[in-house]
């Protein structure tokens, strides 16, 4: 990589918190650097869309083994409880799961639709009272779980990829067309699925 490209990339990394369009020069450069073989430092880039707020974020949250605190804070805010505005610090390893899922399905850095991030205890209880499939001790409340889908990727394929990572819990919500991933113990479940779907993966 030339010195001029290195300088430009460095300037992009000085502001990892900005919301970028996927086509912006910085976003393209950071995505390229994260997938170019031979880089000394691997950049971990996430492009997320919040299905409740309509917000998008494109951010490098980790360089090599080092998480970027300011970027994590921006992601935590992005995943806030949209009903109350409350923010919780997330386990950064859940962001690694999202990043690695895009690689596993063959689309590194692809956009991920966020169905649910953080829930306050009161929000979780409210959802449990009127919605089936909401756990009493949900890891969403602990900042360890995210519900998601990926545009253009079959959700069953996404489920298989998440199970293969074996990083924590994986739930498959067939009728709502999303999966749940968390950093708890390794386990799986399939909500309102046929026996064949439950056994798949």
Predicted regions and their residues:
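N-terminal secretory targeting signals
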Residues: 1-48, 194-201
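Cell wall/extracellular polymer interaction/catalysis modules
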Residues: 42, 46, 52-60, 64-67, ...
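Catalytic cores and adjacent binding grooves of peptidoglycan-active enzymes
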Residues: 44-49, 130-201
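Loop/turn elements at helix/coil->beta-strand transitions in domains of secreted/extracellular proteins
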Residues: 55, 107-112, 166-169, 177
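Extracytoplasmic/lumenal soluble domains of exported proteins with redox or metal-associated functions
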Residues: 56, 60, 71-74, 201
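Active-site acidic/histidine clusters and adjacent loop/turn architecture
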Residues: 63-115
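Extracytoplasmic/secreted envelope proteins and their assembly/folding machinery
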Residues: 72, 95-102, 124, 128, ...
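Acidic helix-start/capping segments at beta-turn-to-alpha-helix junctions
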Residues: 110-126
């Amino acid at each position: 990589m030339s010195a001029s490209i290195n300088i430009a990339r460095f300037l992009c990394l000085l502001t990892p918190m900005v919301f970028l369009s996927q086509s912006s020069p910085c976003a393209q450069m950071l995505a390229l650097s994260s997938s170019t073989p031979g880089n000394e430092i691997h950049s971990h880039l996430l492009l997320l869309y919040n299905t409740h707020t309509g917000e998008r974020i494109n951010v490098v949250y980790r360089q090599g083994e080092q998480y970027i605190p300011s970027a994590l804070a921006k992601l935590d805010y992005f995943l806030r409880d949209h009903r109350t505005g409350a923010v919780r610090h997330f386990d950064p390893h859940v962001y690694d799961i999202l990043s690695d899922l895009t690689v596993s399905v063959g689309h590194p850095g692809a956009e991920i639709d966020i169905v649910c991030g953080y829930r306050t205890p009161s929000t979780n209880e409210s959802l449990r009272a009127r919605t089936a499939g909401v756990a009493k001790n949900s890891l969403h409340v602990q900042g360890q779980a995210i519900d998601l889908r990926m545009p253009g990727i079959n959700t069953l394929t996404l489920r298989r990829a998440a199970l293969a990572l074996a990083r924590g819990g994986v739930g498959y919500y067939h009728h709502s067309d999303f999966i749940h991933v968390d950093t708890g113990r390794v386990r799986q479940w399939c909500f309102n699925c046929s026996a064949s779907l439950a056994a798949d993966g």
